[in-house]
Regions:
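Conserved hydrophobic/aromatic beta-strand scaffold that supports enzyme active sites
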Residues: 2, 20-24, 34-36, 59-66
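Alpha-helical interface subdomain recognition
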Residues: 2-4, 85-216
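Residue-level signal for inorganic ion chemistry
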Residues: 7, 35, 64, 102, ...
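A short core secondary-structure module
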Residues: 8-47
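Flexible, small-/acidic-enriched active-site or ligand-binding loops
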Residues: 12, 38-74
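Solvent-exposed alpha-helices and their adjacent loops that cap or buttress functional pockets
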Residues: 13-17, 27-29, 52-57, 79, ...
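A generic structural signal for well-ordered coil/turn residues at beta-strand boundaries
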Residues: 17-19, 30-31, 40, 56-63, ...
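Acidic-glycine-rich active-site phosphate/pyrophosphate-binding loop
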Residues: 72-81, 194
């Protein structure tokens, strides 16, 4: 006995380079299930897509057209798959990724603004610049604490769905704002590749889309 998989998924990390694919599918009459699929198998195709951010992840579009897999390829025969938990855990990972990128934005822009001199003084002496840096630090701390809380509750075996969602929501909304503010603080330099803030801005924009629409 086996299964036939049919479907298509975008934004698959390393989808064109992976040696094995982990595929989540909805089985007729059974519910969600997970399978390990060989990407070289007949019916499996992948196309690397040029996204504006997260390019090192080699995000790809993977298509499965009547792919036949054996029953042994199905994971968790003894324990039903908790797909919602998998999604919630991935939300925590996405939030943590955003926290790291936002920390890089803060560190870089703070040093730049302290060294950038205009009208005889560092631009951090201007209230508008100092306030923007302070706002980035405040929002980043909020992102980090929500992510820590969600991860801690998950590790302790406590309910964490709400916490994971809030961490993802904060990371997506505030992450994009921090990326935008980082570019803004550098002015014209924020739009050239000599400075990394343009890369982080693109990455944060892409991170906000990894988990799909925020209300989901």
């Amino acid at each position: 006995n086996g299964y036939v998989l049919l479907g298509e998924k975008t934004l698959v990390p390393f989808g064109s380079d992976a040696e094995q694919l982990l595929v989540f599918a909805e089985l007729e009459g059974e519910g969600p299930a997970a399978f390990v699929v060989d990407p070289k198998q007949r019916g499996v195709s992948s196309t690397r897509e040029a996204f504006m951010g997260l390019r090192p992840l080699s995000l790809s579009r993977v298509k499965l057209e009547n792919v036949e897999v054996s029953a042994a390829s199905k994971l968790g025969e003894q324990t039903p798959l908790n797909l919602e938990r998998v999604i919630d855990l991935s939300r925590i990972g996405t939030a943590a990724l955003a926290v790291g990128v936002c920390q890089a934005v803060l560190d870089y822009t703070k040093n730049y603004c302290n060294e950038r001199v205009a009208f005889g003084e560092p631009i951090t002496h201007r209230q508008s610049v100092a306030f923007m840096l302070a706002d980035i630090a405040i929002e980043l701390d909020g992102m980090r604490l929500l992510t820590y809380r969600a991860a801690s509750r998950a590790e302790q075996g406590l309910p964490f769905k709400r916490d994971a969602y809030l961490a993802q929501l904060q990371a997506a909304e505030k992450g994009m704002k921090i990326g935008t503010d980082g570019v803004q603080l550098l002015g014209g330099h924020g739009f050239i590749r000599e400075h990394l803030v343009e890369l982080w801005y693109r990455n944060l924009r892409a991170i906000s889309l990894l988990q799909g629409s925020l209300p989901v």
